[in-house]
């Protein structure tokens, strides 16, 4: 399915594991079917929430292959192919494109970082090498570097770079991006708690962690807001805002996987260095799930 600058809720999928740490493909199938049945508008696999940094390249490819096979064109599948090594990013991007991905999510180069020209070329050379749409991923809290507004503005002119997942949480930055991009460049919230503020400045929706827990509601909030029923969207957003925030009470994806296990979805453990939540935070999260009617 073509990725046509989707307006809606794209779930940032978790990767379920068995207790021995191997990928649980049976549960992954169940989770994908649950998302599609709930109306999710798109699937992102191998994002931050999918724990790709702790998986081998072979495991990454097996998750991509399985996801594309199960989804079977019912909604677009975006794959995180980013790396802090441009050559590695190129290799993965071409591989996932050839496997049938509909779009690619490219993170800014973490740890080694880059100057503005290096940042531009990191994304542009990858976009030059593939024919499926590419989205930028700005998450400076993880990478230690932000994609500057001038670099985003320049990259937005590339015919194969179609949007950005903005996960800095900085509304001033987001507004500057919204001001400099054209109507064909999509701005997605990468933070569930500010999805509505971003849509109010022209955002296309959210790439969501919360959608792992409440996929139908996440889809409905975005659909209502973009469809003109802003009052209902805001009411539901505020109703579940505490849960959205508590899904980040510890580093993602620890809370969301913990929540899904509490809900009986059997997604298994995280891989080290991620580990179980503190008892105090488990109690807070359980209370939020109960308040939301999920337990």
Where are these regions (language model features)?
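Alpha-helical structural signal in soluble globular domains
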Residues: 38, 62, 66-70, 95, ...
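Short, amphipathic alpha-helical "lid/cap" segments that border enzyme active or binding sites
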Residues: 25, 32, 149, 282-289
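Glycine-rich phosphate-binding "P-loop"
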Residues: 138, 160-161, 271-272
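A general structural signal for well-ordered alpha-helical segments in protein cores
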Residues: 28, 60, 64, 89, ...
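Short secondary-structure transition/capping segments
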Residues: 55-58, 91, 116-119, 147-149, ...
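Catalytic alpha/beta core domains of metabolic enzymes, predominantly
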Residues: 128, 142-248
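C-terminal alpha-helical cap/extension of soluble enzyme domains
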Residues: 5-16, 38-40, 49, 200-203, ...
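Active-site beta->alpha loop and helix N-cap motifs at the rims of alpha/beta catalytic domains
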Residues: 2-11, 17-146
């Amino acid at each position: 399915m073509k990725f046509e600058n989707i307006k809606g809720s794209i779930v940032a999928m978790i990767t379920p594991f068995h207790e021995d740490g191997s990928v649980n493909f049976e549960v992954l199938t169940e989770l994908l079917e649950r998302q599609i049945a709930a109306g999710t508008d798109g699937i992102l696999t191998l994002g931050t929430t999918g724990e790709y940094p702790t998986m081998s390249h072979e495991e990454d490819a097996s998750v991509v292959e399985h996801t594309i096979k199960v989804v079977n064109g019912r909604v677009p599948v975006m794959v995180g192919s980013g790396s802090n090594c441009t050559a590695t990013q190129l290799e993965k991007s071409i591989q996932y494109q050839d496997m049938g991905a509909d779009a690619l999510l490219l993170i800014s180069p973490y740890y080694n970082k880059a100057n503005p020209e290096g940042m531009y070329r990191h994304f542009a050379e990858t976009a030059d090498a593939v024919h499926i749409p590419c989205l930028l991923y700005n998450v400076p809290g993880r990478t230690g570097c932000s994609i500057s507004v001038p670099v985003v503005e320049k990259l937005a002119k590339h015919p194969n770079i179609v949007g950005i997942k903005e996960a800095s949480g900085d509304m001033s930055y987001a507004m500057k991006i919204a001001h400099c991009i054209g109507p064909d460049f999509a701005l997605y919230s990468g933070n569930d708690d500010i999805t509505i503020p971003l849509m109010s400045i022209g955002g296309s929706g959210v790439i969501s962690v919360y959608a792992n827990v409440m996929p139908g509601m996440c889809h409905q909030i975005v659909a209502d807001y973009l469809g003109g029923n802003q009052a209902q969207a805001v009411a539901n957003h505020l109703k579940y805002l505490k849960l959205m925030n508590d899904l980040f009470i510890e580093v993602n994806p620890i809370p969301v996987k913990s929540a899904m296990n509490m809900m009986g979805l059997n997604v298994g453990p995280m891989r080290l260095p991620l580990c179980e939540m503190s008892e105090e935070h488990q109690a807070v999260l359980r209370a939020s799930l109960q308040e939301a009617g999920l337990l």
